[in-house]
Amino acid sequence: MTQNRAELNRNLAQMLKGGVIMDVTTPEQAKIAQDAGACAVMALERIPADIRAAGGVSRMSDPAMIKGIQEAVSIPVMAKVRIGHIAEARILQAIEIDYIDESEVLSPADDVYHIDKNQFDVPFVCGAKNLGEALRRIAEGAAMIRTKGEPGTGDVIQAVRHMRTMNKQIRELVGLRDDEVYEAAKQLAVPYDLAKYVHDNGRLPVVNFAAGGVATPADAALMMELGAEGVFVGSGIFKSGDPAKRAAAIVKATANWQDADLLAKLSENLGEAMVGINEDEIQTIMAARGE
């Protein structure tokens, strides 16, 4: 990937800012997401809640199923590959997917190395729990970062924790003297030029979305309040009582997160939310993958 291509990919991801990306498993769901105002959809065979419930090994989705979703909608389509699985990423690039998510939701293929995303033309999305993880993924070529949260739970606490941690570490880096950034880069285990960028600009060099446990318009507004530049919603929509209404409400809440009166209206009569799993009831399985 040339420097120009890397810049283009980052700018492509910037265009999703302020939007909602929804997990979908069928062309029908993709159309519901598009009609609700989603800025992109994530095509996968099983949503995270079902992956968590079923256990076993979770892999890249069938390309035929992904193509069906690509044909059904005009908005960008993303798909997930296992951490470190270069061949799955090549397959998705071959079918002209718009973005690849190297995702901890699927079973990791490599417990040491992530994909060298600089070898690909397609932009990559990666998860991160803290600033060090985010900058390492960006060094590998990621064009977009999202919090890991704990997918499939409907419990937003981990996404909140990861976003707060990342932004706290950014503020700490900004407050350093120029000559202290070298040591900070060493402690974070990241390239100096990326640490210096954060120090100078007070933000990541790529967009940073919230993901993991977002299930209500209020959850989406909370993540925007905490500094997210957009939101991924996985199980929270199509595991709920009225997916179309909830999807549209979350899109509007993300765009108007400071308008409490509108948020109150959007939260009314949405049908039953996904049941969810409290963080204390589970082992953290997915968020810890791929550091």
Curated annotation (Swiss-Prot):
D-ribose 5-phosphate binds at residues 23, 152, 213, 234-235. Pathway: Cofactor biosynthesis; pyridoxal 5'-phosphate biosynthesis. PANTHER family: PYRIDOXAL 5'-PHOSPHATE SYNTHASE SUBUNIT SNZ1-RELATED. The active site is at 80 (schiff-base intermediate with d-ribose 5-phosphate). This is Pyridoxal 5'-phosphate synthase subunit PdxS. It comes from the Bacteria. It comes from Bifidobacterium longum (strain NCC 2705). GO terms for molecular function: pyridoxal 5'-phosphate synthase (glutamine hydrolysing) activity. Its EC number is 4.3.3.6. GO terms for biological process: amino acid metabolic process; pyridoxal phosphate biosynthetic process; pyridoxine biosynthetic process. HAMAP family: PdxS. The keyword Lyase applies. It catalyses: aldehydo-D-ribose 5-phosphate + D-glyceraldehyde 3-phosphate + L-glutamine = pyridoxal 5'-phosphate + L-glutamate + phosphate + 3 H2O + H(+). Belongs to the PdxS/SNZ family. It is an enzyme of class 4 (lyase). In the presence of PdxT, forms a dodecamer of heterodimers. The lineage of its organism: Bacteria, Bacillati, Actinomycetota, Actinomycetes, Bifidobacteriales.
